[in-house]
Regions:
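Divalent cation-coordinating acidic motifs and surrounding scaffolds
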Residues: 1-176
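Conserved catalytic region of serine esterases and O-acyltransferases that act on ester linkages
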Residues: 179
Length: 179
């Protein structure tokens, strides 16, 4: 059959609408935190779609300090909430994963309280999940509270060596998404 210009225009518009639908973009960032007196309190690496860069940033961090009780978790959370370039898109999924093995210092007074920080995160549309490494019960209680107040999930990460890396068919594709 013969296509009229209106038909061609309608079909082109339909194709352009389909092609123009944005696919989800994954952006990740890091905020490393330690404690006062360590070589740094926080190091923030802003959100990026380049997952290779996130991995490189992660490799620049080394464990240090620690083992001496609470850390400046509140400053790390504050930086994650306020210093990352979060999307302003209403439909964007915005999540923080707090990962650590120590409870927060709540006696410094240089940040809002844990409750205030998590309320701010929720108001900004952020979900705060908490992954506790190890089995310290005080840290576990704090991380459970973070997940509850941050409307996220608590994720225990055992440190007994029983964790295994499992390759998936999606690993190569995930790496490509960051390029």
């Amino acid at each position: 059959g013969i296509l009229h210009s209106a038909d061609v225009s309608a079909r082109l518009n339909a194709i352009l609408e389909r092609v123009g639908i944005p696919s989800p973009r994954l952006r990740m960032g890091l905020v490393a935190f330690r404690d006062k007196g360590d070589s740094y309190v926080t190091k923030a690496f802003d959100l990026t779609g380049n997952l290779d860069q996130v991995y490189k940033d992660l490799l620049t961090l080394e464990a240090g300090g620690g083992g001496d009780g609470p850390e400046h978790v509140l400053q790390g959370l504050s930086d994650a909430i306020d210093k990352m370039s979060w999307s302003s898109e209403a439909k964007a999924v915005k999540a923080i994963y707090l990962v650590g093995d120590a409870s927060p210092h709540e006696d410094y007074g240089d940040t809002p309280s844990l409750k205030e920080l998590l309320q701010k995160a929720v108001r900004k549309g952020l979900v705060v999940n908490a992954a506790q490494c190890g089995s310290d019960s005080t840290a576990g209680d704090a991380f459970r509270l973070v997940a509850r107040l941050g409307e996220g999930r608590f994720l225990p990460v055992p440190q007994d060596g029983g964790m295994a890396a499992v390759e998936t068919p999606f690993d190569a594709r995930t790496a490509e998404l960051g390029r």
